[in-house]
């Protein structure tokens, strides 16, 4: 597929790219920079994917298209086949929930879990995707370690209607409709809705090195159902102000961890608005705000064990039952103002801004026995606040073609957890924790250089500091299970800090481009889970407090208080990690009929310090060192295209101790497009075209945790505009 490339949208549908589109793309403004910076002036490794490029990809969800971007670690499993708590994004091996994802400048990161709400932005609604790698906390604050991905959605056009529909393997149905309304010269509306339903596939692996008996009774295909409705309004308020308002509601339902008796339901209301006011030539003010409210009802299923304390009904071993249910209501509200002034002289542009955000939520967990009785309850309620001030200046010297960008942001982060308790059976014997408020001021600088060797060739480098605050799932969500013991949230967690440097080059010629980037990142206070030790006095005291156990007891040697097991896990900041690597993106138009794309990433991510059992100096779990892509597109006629892709993922490990290997694999994809006329385009795709059976990368604790990669899947569909 054509990736790491894009081109300007034309006035009518077009399958083949226009001439010199790589050169034209270089001047496209990247909204994720917050400063109207053209692509060829960004000192960080940056990619733009346009709608036309997205439509050449065999994959049918935006997460699976992004997995082919160098530096992205998303396994070969569509988001809807994953539990909502596992729909994460890892960039440059830095770990999940450390990269910011936006839709039209508003966050798509789940406010509680930090995962990505891919379901709220179906592929049919996306116009372009901007991807800036590297530390960007200087502009965006939290989640700014791995970079930022901004999806620009489609805007109203000519009062048209559009229907996109496809059907594929596993009875997967995807339907999207939209209606554009040109209400007046100053008001345009877009009303859209989409629906996805799939029978899914059984993604629990039983091929080597997975355990052959990993699929237990009650486990099956990961069926899922998503739906969204959205109303977008774009308006002009006078000659100098334009703005937008977006209101949406989305649902996502699936089986929890492929257990057909356990269901998940996530319901999200999403509101965003913004204005841009031109004060004078080169001066403007931007105002934006957003609000999201989510209700997440989740069940977990387990298989009974005769010896388990949860098996009060004495069910036969492996009999499925609901082992817990959760209710997580949460919301986030944010707003910001920024001022941009273009200047002449020593400084070319100045940006200043201020913003704030609140995240509030709670978690109620009922841990259940096989009879449905409540064995214990975990509850916590809390909030986090972020307030930031930022500034950025750009300067280009006249005597040498060097552009310098200096950005600085100061954030104040606070966290409060007024209620945190764990109970015994039926909610009795509650053990309350008194939690001190957390408060930290964080400095996020970024200094970037871009040197123009020629019109086609530049060198770039950037040094930065970024941060990531603990998620509410780390500070509020506690639970127990028959297999994993007691897992407690830690409301005393603090922020992670990353220091990084990268250097690269971009070379663009008439028929293509080549981008090369080297990076190094150091993360301190990295959040991880820690298994409390029975011979550690500090751990024993903490276990007594969490379990509500009597002094003198040791819940880590014998179950005591409200704890159902001697296995007690707790989140901690006691890890440091290092991520270093290389990224390469290449595109070349061999002829008007042929185009070639290639990409490669080499990523070495290790722990440099750890208080857990994870060893230092070893490649961390879920991060393959080598990932490569190759794509070839043929345009037999201007209205048709055939794209074939190859994705290679090298050897990796499910655990950092390197006891659970994940073998390397390569898979192939295919897509054919044909534009019948300006109103009708048909397509057919194949994912895993050769039907390879393979285990995709991830993390886990035993050989029953392996995940099967996407099996062979065919899709046929069309887009109809009228």
Give names to the regions the model predicted.
Residues 1-59, 63-67, 181:
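N-terminal Sec signal peptide and the immediately downstream disordered periplasmic leader
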Residues 63, 67-106:
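Extracytoplasmic beta-strand/coil segments of soluble accessory domains associated
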Residues 89-90, 106-133:
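Short acidic/polar hinge/loop motifs at secondary-structure boundaries
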Residues 150, 158-159, 166, 172, ...:
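Periplasmic-side early beta-strands and strand-to-turn transitions of outer-membrane beta-barrels
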Residues 234-250, 267-427, 434, 450-452, ...:
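Face-selective signature of the C-terminal outer-membrane beta-barrel domain
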Residues 263-278, 328-330, 378-384, 434-444, ...:
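Outer-membrane beta-barrel signature, preferentially recognizing the C-terminal barrel domain
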Residues 396-404, 412, 519-522, 531-534, ...:
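Gram-negative outer-membrane beta-barrel transporters
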Residues 467, 519-525, 529-531, 648-655, ...:
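C-terminal beta-signal and adjacent terminal beta-strands/loops
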